[in-house]
Amino acid sequence: MKLQNLKVPLTLFAALVLAQAGASSALAQSNSDGFETVINSPPDSFSFGNNTIGSNTQVNVLDGVVFSSFTIGAADGTDTNIELNVFDGAVVGGTLFANTGSVVNVLGGNVGAENTGGDLRASGGTINISDGSQIFHRLNASDGGEINISGGTVFRLNLIGDATVNVTGGTVTSDRSSSSVNAVLNVSEGELLGTFSFFNGTVNLTGGRGQVFFARAANIFGGVVSDAIFASEGRIAGGRQQSVGFTSDVVLSGGEFLLNGEPVTGTVTLGSLNSFYNPFFREESPDVLTGTFADGTPFVFSSVNDSLENVTLETVTLPSNDTSPLNIGPGEVSTGGRTGQTLTVQPGGLIDESFSAVDTILNVRGGTVADGLKLARSVLTVEAGSVVGAGTSSYGSDVNVSGGQVGPNLEVFSGTLRLSGGRIGRGLTIDPEATATIVGGEFRLNGVPITEPDVSLGANDALEGTLADGTPFVFSSSAGDRLETVTLEQVSLPDASTTPIIVDESTVNIPLGLRPGQTLTVEDGGQLGDDFTAFDTTFNVRGGQVSQTTEIYRSTVNVSGGQFGAITSFIDSLSEVPILVRDNSTLNVLAGEVGVVEIDSGSIANVTGGSTGRFVIGSGGEVNIEGGRTGTIQLFDDTVLNIFGGSFGQLFLSSADDSSVNFTGTEFFLDGDLIDDLEVGETRLLDASLTLFTLSGVLSDGSEFSSPINRRFTDNLQISITRVDSISEPVLLGDVDLNGSVNFSDISPFILVLVSGAFQAEADCDENGVVNFLDISPFIAILSSL
C-alpha cells in the first residue's frame, strides 16, 4: 500500500496505516491438513542442500542445525501454498529464498546463526519473525516481498527493492538503504536501531521507537524518533521527534501553532539542512516553532536542531487540554506538557524521551526525565534525587537546578539557568542572550580565586567552584562547555568533611564530587555516578566502578582495582567520553581496568599494571608506562611518552609537535636491524630524517614490542632509545629494607617510610601509589603469611 494521498481525512488516514501494518500473515504455523506434503525434521530426513521446496508443502525444522541453503517456491512464482517453520531450538545457517507463494515463519529459532553465514530473503514471498527469534545475518526484502516482525531480534534489515516491512514488536537494526519507490516500512511497536534510509520510499509510524529515518514520504501518527527524521513529503500528526528535516510537501497537522511565541498559519520555514547553528557566531536568535499535534502531543522545533522549508501547517480540532496540576508518581509516564499545565515528577515517575514542554511548569522532585527534553517558554525545576537525561534544549525558559543530576549537552537559549546544587554533565551551552547564575563559593578562574560577581570566559578558560549544596563543579571549553558570561552568587557553604570517605556496596549517601582536602576510596561494590569532579584531593579506586565522565584537577588518583571509566573495544573507545586528568594531577594505574583517559596541563600518568583502554595526551601531559596493558596512545603538541615496559597499542603521532617518545629497554631494532652500537646506559635520539619506520625490541621489564612510527607530518617530534643492561626485577611488597626477603626486620623501615610521607614501592602494600595508614593492614597480612 502506497501512502501518498495527503487529502484523506486524518482519522481515516491513520486507520488505513494501522490496517496496513496489521494486515500481515498470521505469525504462526498453519494447520498441516492444508498441505499435501508435511516434513518434520527431525525425525523426517530431508536433504536441504540446494533444493527447492515446491507447492503444497510444509517443512518444520524442529531442532538441530541446518547449514544448507535452499529455495522456497519457484523463482518464477508458479509454486503456491508453501510454508517453512523454524522452531525454537532450530538453527538454519544457510541462505533462504522465500519466493512468491511461500511463507517462512521463524517461531523462536535462529537463522544465519553466528559464524555460520546465510541470509533470509523475501523475494516475493512472506517472512514472519516472532518472539525469541534471532536473524543474525541480512534479512532482505525485495521483488514484492513482505516481512512481518512481531518480536525477536533482527540484526541487519535490508530493503533492496519494492517490498513492505511491518514491525509490530521486537528489535530491528538497519543494514542498507533502499532506493525503491515502492519500499514501505510500517512501524506500530518495537525498537528500530541505526539509520533506516528509504530515499524514494515511505515510512509510516504509529508507534514504537526509532533512531534515524531518511524517506521520501513520512507519515507519523505516534511513536518516538529519538534522533532525527528527514522527509520531502508526508503528514506529521502525532508522536515525538527529537530532530526533523522536512520540506514543502510535508504537512504538520495539529494546532496551537506559534512561531517565536506569536500565532502563525499557512507555511513556515526555519533552519536549514545545509547550515549548522552556532550560538556564538550568529546575527539573530534561533527561531522556535511550537504547537500541538493532532493526537495531543506538544512539539518544539527550532532552527538550532531542526529544518522546516515551507512546511504546511494544518489546523485541526485538538483533544481537550486539562490544566489541572498533575503528579507523576511511581510507574507513571508522561509524554508531553501543553500550555498552562503543571507537571510534578515524583520519585519513580518518568518523563519519556523527546518530551516537549510548551508554556509548562515542570517540577522534577526525585523522578526521572529521559533524554531529549525540549522546553519552550517553560519553567524547569530539578531537585535532589532527580535525574534529567542528556540533550535538554531550553528556549526562552527558566531552568533551576538545586540538586540531582542533569545529563550532558544542556543548551539554554534566550532564557535563564540558575545552578545552586546537583551536577550538570559536559557540553553545557549558554546562549549569549541567556543568563546563567551559579550559587556557591570557592570560585576559581583557571585555578585562581575570584570574588567578582560577573565572570567572562574565554576560549581556554576554566571556571570551577563549589555549589551551595557542597557539590564541586567545573565548566571549560575543553570539556565542551560554551559560556561567555556567568554571574556568581556567593553564599556560605557547608563544611567539607576531612574524614576519609569509603564508598562500597553499603554506602547510601554517595558524594557527587570531592572538595579540596578530601579523600575518597572506592571499594568492591561501590559506584560513583556520572560527572564526578575532584579538586585538590586524593582519590583511590580499589574496586567497584567509577564513571568515564569523571574529571580530576590538581589531585592524585590511585587505581589498584575495580573499573575506572568505560571498558570498550578500540572502535567504541574512539567515541567514548574520556576521563579528564588536568592541572598537575597524577594518575597511578597499578591494577584494575581503566577506560579512555585524556591527560594534559602538567599532569602525569604512571602505569605499572592493570589495563588502560586508550590515552589521549594533551599539551603539557606526560605518560609513563612501566607495565600492564595499554591500548592506543594519541599525542598532541608539547607532550611526553616514556615506555619502560608492559604492552601498548598503536601510537598516533601526526599532531605531536614539540613532543618526545622515549623507549627504555635491553635491545632495539630499526626496521628489523639490530642497533648494535648502543651502549648500556646510553640514550640516543633517532635521526630526525627517519620519518616512517618500525622500532622494535625488548623493554626493560622483558616485554617485547614492535611499534610503527610515523612522524612525517610533525615538527620537532623526538624519538629516543635508552639501553639498560638487565631486565628490571619486580617489586617485592613488604621488603622495605631491600634485603630480598620479607621478615620482621622490615617493620622499622616500614614505619620510617610511613611517618616520613615518602614513597617506596616496597612499602606501598596496598599498591595504590602512596604510602599511608591504608598500607598498615596489608603489611601486617604479608608478615602474618610468612
Regions found by a protein language model. Name each.
Residues G22-A28:
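Sec/Tat signal peptide C-region and signal peptidase I cleavage site
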Residues K2-L12:
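Bacterial N-terminal signal peptides that target proteins for export
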Residues D44-S47, V59, V65-S68, G77, ...:
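Extracellular beta-strand scaffolds
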Residues N50-G54, S69-T80, L96-G101, L120-A122, ...:
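Extracellular beta-strand-rich solenoid/capping regions of secreted or surface-exposed proteins
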Residues V184, D398:
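Cationic, beta-structured binding surfaces that engage anionic biopolymers and membranes
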